Structure formats: C-alpha cells, structure tokens
C-alpha cells in the first residue's frame, strides 16, 4: 500500500496540471480600436422590471459562436459583477454572465427592483475574451 501512495500522488498532480493546461486556451487578438458599448439603457437610467438592452459594437462584426470569421465575435452581458471573469478561457454561462451565442444584438432583461450594473464583454467563436478584452464601460440602472 505504501508503494502505491507516491504513484497515486504523482498521478493526481499530473491530472491537475492537465486540467490547468486545458483551462487556458489561446486568445484571439482584438482589432485595434475595437469597442463595445451599451446603446440602451443609458447609464443612470430608471427602468421597468423588464427592459430592453441594446448592444453596440465598433471596429468588428457580430457572428454566432462557433463561426470562424475574421474580426468577429459575440456578446456576453455581465450583470452585477464586482470582478471580471477570468480572461484566459471560455466565459462561464451563469445568471451573471449571459451568453448571446446566436449573434444577438439586444435582449429583454428582467431584474429585481433596485440598483444593478451591466457591462458587455465580446467573446470569440469559443466564448473566450479577445486580447486585449473588448469590454464596455460598466453602467448602472435602477429597476423600479
């Protein structure tokens, strides 16, 4: 049994290193001067419980996830995030990181009453943020 323990420990460490290597994927270079922004609502707006968020993009095009076309990506809406997600792998799909992998440029959003922050982050065909990140200004809305 004691002879198996070092081999088991080595196997676990190699497995962990493999997962770390898989988690970090190459990032696509962003075109110079590419920018993403929220068209609507405006920063500081008061909105109804359900409201429209419209996405804007300059210097790049929008394409669905999985489409390998130069200088294109798709939107991810960051909701109430204090810290940006990791930029070295695919963005997680959570209630705070909403994927628009079909190439959508707007959405209807329903949030609880109160203050909320919204920010856009463009992802490549694999949901990986560009390098450097194409990230909008964070806006704040108040839901009535």
Residue ranges with predicted function:
Residues 112-127, 135-141:
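Internal, hydrophobic beta-strand segments that form the core of beta-sheet-rich folds
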Residues 49, 73, 112-114:
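A glycine-anchored, Pro-Gly-centered beta-turn/N-cap motif
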Residues 7-17:
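Bacterial N-terminal signal peptides
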Residues 51-55, 105, 114-122:
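Short, well-structured beta-strand segments within conserved domains
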Residues 67-75, 135:
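Short coil-to-beta strand junction motifs in C2/discoidin
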Residues 56-67:
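Short amphipathic, basic-aromatic surface patches that mediate peripheral association
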Residues 84-87, 123-131:
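Short acidic/polar inter-strand loop motif in beta-rich domains
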């Amino acid at each position: 049994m004691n002879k198996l323990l070092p081999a088991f420990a080595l196997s676990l460490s190699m497995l962990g290193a493999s997962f770390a290597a898989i988690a970090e994927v190459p990032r696509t270079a962003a075109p110079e001067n590419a920018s993403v922004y929220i068209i609507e609502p405006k920063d500081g707006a008061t909105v109804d419980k359900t409201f429209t968020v419209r996405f804007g993009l300059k210097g790049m095009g929008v394409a669905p996830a999985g489409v390998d076309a130069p200088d294109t990506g798709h939107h991810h809406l960051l909701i109430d995030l204090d810290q940006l997600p990791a930029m070295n792998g695919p963005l997680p799909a959570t209630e705070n990181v909403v994927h628009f992998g079909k190439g959508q440029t707007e959405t209807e959003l329903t949030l609880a009453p109160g203050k909320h922050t919204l920010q856009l982050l463009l992802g490549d065909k694999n949901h990986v943020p560009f390098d450097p990140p194409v990230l909008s200004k964070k806006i704040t809305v108040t839901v009535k």
